[in-house]
């Protein structure tokens, strides 16, 4: 029977993404969001690295003690006693000690023999355990380590007091069948020990390798929101939890909260989400080809592996030269506009003859319908409203601090500091005018905001 949970490493591995830095307040907010999402463990950072990481973990542990955060809190540490002491004094639930165990790492980085490495591993794990904290040992570059030595490393870690060993595919070279075989063999050779998979995505196989590791017996998958991490990152959280739900029938987090957490990390990391990103990208449940849209309108299962509502999303489709009559009719019905079959044929012909337009927005379709029918059409209020809100800040505030506060308001998609009469430009999206008004009021109520000017987006080219 498969048993699996998620360790989220956005605050540790994720912050190792080039150009990404989280403030202390952001670290705390992210930890709360991850706990609300339901991840089993939060790797809160390596406290010996810098004072801000230390302070962030301190505040996160405090929230754990108060019951606000429920996930297990993990502190990262080198196999160095001072690192362990710093993590232990923060009273984290678990210390994760890492050490490179491949011959490449032993020779080039540690300048150590295998025997010396085993001694360091045993001593530091025992030292951490003496502080009354649980220990996970990470076999860094485990995927390129001689198997017999990896068995010895795992056994040494277990005997020294670690209850978990993480096998790190540090340069992302594993492939699924080998991954499953590796974990199955380790569990067979070194029982009474739980295993994690830490899969990097250098070959684009991180999710597949994580699933294979779970099949092989791994019980914790390391992931980061939006797949952040060193180089090209590790297992993307939203992808692995969706795959676990689909393939194993296990809901390891609250799937409908993924979009919020993904957007939060997108804002704080400054790394934009590609529109075609699985699960949380703008195109994840957006259909285009006429045959596809007709199928989805008849039965969404034709072109969707799971309903978008599972992930707090909605389905939609684009209108362009690929569009068929089913999609066009449905779009006009949603707009509340009555179009005859003959008029529909004329509109569709106009759309297909203009091959340069990438997206037909609702306003474009109304213009076409008015052109064909000769009538002035009054549509229903739009289901999605996009707006640009110009913000003027108080003269005595730091604009960047206001920008950060605005970036976490629900409905805010992008925040930019600008020159001119206004200081900040905010892009927002709302399902209706009531929600738009609520977003605007939240922006106006933000500390440091003096005034706003709202412009509705009517057309995108």
Swiss-Prot record:
Protein family (similarity comment): Belongs to the alpha-IPM synthase/homocitrate synthase family. Homocitrate synthase LYS20/LYS21 subfamily.
Domain Pyruvate carboxyltransferase: 4-259
Gene Ontology terms, MF aspect: 2-isopropylmalate synthase activity; homocitrate synthase activity; metal ion binding
UniProt catalytic activity: acetyl-CoA + 2-oxoglutarate + H2O = (2R)-homocitrate + CoA + H(+)
Binding annotation for 2-oxoglutarate: 12, 76, 136, 170
Keywords: Amino-acid biosynthesis, Lysine biosynthesis, Magnesium, Manganese, Metal-binding, Transferase
Residues at which Mg(2+) binds: 13, 198, 200
Active site per the UniProt annotation: 292
PANTHER family hit by this protein: HOMOCITRATE SYNTHASE, HOMOCITRATE SYNTHASE-RELATED
Enzyme Commission number(s) from the entry: 2.3.3.14
Pathway(s) annotated for this protein in UniProt: Amino-acid biosynthesis; L-lysine biosynthesis via AAA pathway; L-alpha-aminoadipate from 2-oxoglutarate: step 1/5
Cofactors demanded by this protein: Mg(2+); Mn(2+)
Organism domain of life: Archaea
Phylogenetic classification of the source organism: Archaea, Thermoproteota, Thermoprotei, Sulfolobales, Sulfolobaceae
Enzymatic class: transferase
Organism field: Saccharolobus solfataricus (strain ATCC 35092 / DSM 1617 / JCM 11322 / P2)
Function of the protein: Catalyzes the aldol-type condensation of 2-oxoglutarate with acetyl-CoA to yield homocitrate. Carries out the first step of the alpha-aminoadipate (AAA) lysine biosynthesis pathway.
GO BP of this protein: L-leucine biosynthetic process; lysine biosynthetic process via aminoadipic acid
Cystine connections: none
HAMAP family from the UniProt entry: Homocitr_synth_fung_arch
Protein name: Homocitrate synthase
PROSITE patterns attached to this UniProt entry: PYR_CT (PS50991)
């Amino acid at each position: 029977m498969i048993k699996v949970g998620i360790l989220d490493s956005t605050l540790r591995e994720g912050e190792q993404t080039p150009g990404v830095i989280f403030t202390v307040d952001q670290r705390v907010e992210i930890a709360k969001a991850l706990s609300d999402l339901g991840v089993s463990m939060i790797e809160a950072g390596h406290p010996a690295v810098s004072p801000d990481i230390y302070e962030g973990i301190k505040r996160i542990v405090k929230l754990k003690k108060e019951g606000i955060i429920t996930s297990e809190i993990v502190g990262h540490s080198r196999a160095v006693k001072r690192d362990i002491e710093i993590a232990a004094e923060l009273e984290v639930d678990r210390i994760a000690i890492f050490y490179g165990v491949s011959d490449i790492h032993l020779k080039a980085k540690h300048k150590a023999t295998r025997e010396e490495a085993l001694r360091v591993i045993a001593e530091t794990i025992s030292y951490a355990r003496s502080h009354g904290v649980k220990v996970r040992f990470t076999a860094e570059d485990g995927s390129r380590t001689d198997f017999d030595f990896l068995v010895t490393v795992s056994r040494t870690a277990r005997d020294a007091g670690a209850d978990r060993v993480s096998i790190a595919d540090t340069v992302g070279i594993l492939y699924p069948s080998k991954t499953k075989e590796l974990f199955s063999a380790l569990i067979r050779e070194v029982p009474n020990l739980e295993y994690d998979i830490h899969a990097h995505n250098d070959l684009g196989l991180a999710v597949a390798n994580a699933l294979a590791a779970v099949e092989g017996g791994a019980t914790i998958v390391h992931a980061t929101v939006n797949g952040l991490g060193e180089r090209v990152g590790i297992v993307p959280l939203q992808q692995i939890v969706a795959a676990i739900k689909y393939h194993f029938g296990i809901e390891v987090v609250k799937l409908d909260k993924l979009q919020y957490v993904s957007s939060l990390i997108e804002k704080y990391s400054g790394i934009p989400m590609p529109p075609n990103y699985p699960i949380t990208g703008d195109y994840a449940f957006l259909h285009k080809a006429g045959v596809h849209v007709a199928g989805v309108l008849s039965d969404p299962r034709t072109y969707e592996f799971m309903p978008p509502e599972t992930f707090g999303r909605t389905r939609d489709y684009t209108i362009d030269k690929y569009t068929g009559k089913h999609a066009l009719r449905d779009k006009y019905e949603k707009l509340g506009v009555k179009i005859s079959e003959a008029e529909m044929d004329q509109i569709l012909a106009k759309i297909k003859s203009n091959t340069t337009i990438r997206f037909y927005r609702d306003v474009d379709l109304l213009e076409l319908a008015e052109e064909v029918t000769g009538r002035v059409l009054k549509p229903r209020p739009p289901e999605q409203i996009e707006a640009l809100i110009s913000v003027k800040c108080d003269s005595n505030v730091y604009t960047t601090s206001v920008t950060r506060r605005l970036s976490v308001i629900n409905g805010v998609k992008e925040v930019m500091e600008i020159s001119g009469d206004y200081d900040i430009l905010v892009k927002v999206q709302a399902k209706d005018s009531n929600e738009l008004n609520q977003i605007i009021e939240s922006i106006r109520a933000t500390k440091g905001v003096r005034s706003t000017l709202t412009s509705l987006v009517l057309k995108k080219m």
